[in-house]
């Protein structure tokens, strides 16, 4: 199996704490870089668990189209600003952050007070502007999840009239790009490939951790395929042999034996295979001579039946 290595050739942290990592993976066989790049990108963009603000409560506000006295931004603007906050919750439980700010003040993400389980990634991100003589009291709910969860899919438990729910974007990876380069020709003349993948996160996780987590998810997905076992579905019977499908007429039995079997609803060899020699003798007007005749006819096509019902 071809051995390859992974090198991180670039790592940047932006002003909003977003992180960018660039990795080189190779050498790979032709076609493997595309397979690897597409698989990693799919998991990175939609399969990683992340944290997001899912609801906001503002004192004195019970709908998203309201305005707040003494606050420059309207409620919709504040909800959008909260939606864009990057947070990292280390628990699967609902976490609540609160702030009370008296103007004049620029209300920022760092003003939110959370438990030790939640980290605000970009504390300088603006939430609202409060004028002198006014105040803003705000509460945000933080949850963990995967992918994108629109408002209409929220649990009905969170249905308080003053709790403004927002679309939750749990994806910690903002962007993934990859390119494929050809590397040196290997022995035998085959060209190798190298995957260059760029991962941009919101800062709640590092590109290194995001890449490792996506790889682990792919391993878990494919691992069961390495030990595939065939399980016969219940109720399925094996395909009948060609001999068992031979009609009774083709056994060339005597008229007496043939008529007795037909009256007993025996129409083919497969029907006869359910009989033992003793069963044949119990058919009305069917003697040992007729039974022996049937046994011989079956043996000519390679089929035998037991002498008694208990024979194996």
Swiss-Prot record:
Residues 236-312 are annotated as: Alpha C-terminal domain (alpha-CTD). In cyanobacteria the RNAP catalytic core is composed of 2 alpha, 1 beta, 1 beta', 1 gamma and 1 omega subunit. When a sigma factor is associated with the core the holoenzyme is formed, which can initiate transcription. InterPro entries: DNA-dir_RNA_pol_insert, DNA-dir_RNA_pol_RpoA/D/Rpb3, DNA-dir_RpoA, RBP11-like, RNAP_asu_C, RNApol_insert_sf. It is an enzyme of class 2 (transferase). Keywords: DNA-directed RNA polymerase, Nucleotidyltransferase, Transcription, Transferase. This is DNA-directed RNA polymerase subunit alpha. The N-terminal domain is essential for RNAP assembly and basal transcription, whereas the C-terminal domain is involved in interaction with transcriptional regulators and with upstream promoter elements. It comes from Prochlorococcus marinus (strain MIT 9303). Its EC number is 2.7.7.6.
């Amino acid at each position: 199996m071809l051995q390859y290595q992974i090198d991180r050739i670039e790592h940047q942290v932006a002003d909003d704490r977003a992180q960018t990592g660039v990795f080189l993976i190779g050498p790979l066989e032709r076609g493997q870089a595309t397979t690897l790049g597409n698989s990693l990108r799919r998991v990175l963009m939609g399969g990683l668990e992340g944290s997001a603000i899912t609801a906001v409560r503002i004192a004195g506000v019970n709908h998203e189209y309201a305005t707040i006295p003494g606050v420059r931004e309207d409620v919709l603007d504040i909800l959008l600003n909260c939606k864009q906050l990057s947070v990292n919750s280390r628990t699967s439980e609902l976490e609540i952050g609160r702030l009370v700010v008296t103007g004049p003040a620029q209300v920022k993400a760092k003003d939110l007070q959370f438990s030790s389980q939640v980290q605000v990634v970009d504390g300088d991100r603006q939430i609202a502007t409060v004028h002198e003589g006014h105040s803003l009291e705000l509460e945000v709910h933080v949850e963990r999840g995967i992918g994108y969860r629109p408002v209409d899919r929220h649990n009905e438990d969170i249905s308080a009239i003053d709790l403004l729910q927002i679309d939750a974007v749990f994806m910690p990876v903002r962007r993934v790009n990859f390119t494929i380069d050809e590397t040196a020709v290997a022995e035998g003349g085959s060209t190798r490939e190298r995957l260059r993948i760029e991962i941009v996160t919101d800062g709640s996780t590092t590109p290194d951790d995001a890449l490792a987590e996506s790889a682990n998810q792919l391993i878990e997905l494919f691992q069961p395929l390495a030990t595939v076992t065939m399980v016969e579905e219940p109720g399925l019977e094996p395909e009948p042999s060609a001999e068992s499908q031979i009609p009774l007429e083709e056994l060339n039995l005597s008229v007496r034996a043939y008529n007795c079997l037909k009256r007993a609803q025996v129409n083919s060899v497969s029907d006869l295979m359910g009989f033992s020699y003793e069963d044949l003798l119990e058919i009305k007007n069917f003697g040992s001579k007729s039974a022996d005749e049937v046994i011989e006819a079956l043996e000519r096509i390679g089929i035998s039946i037991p002498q008694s019902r208990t024979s194996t």
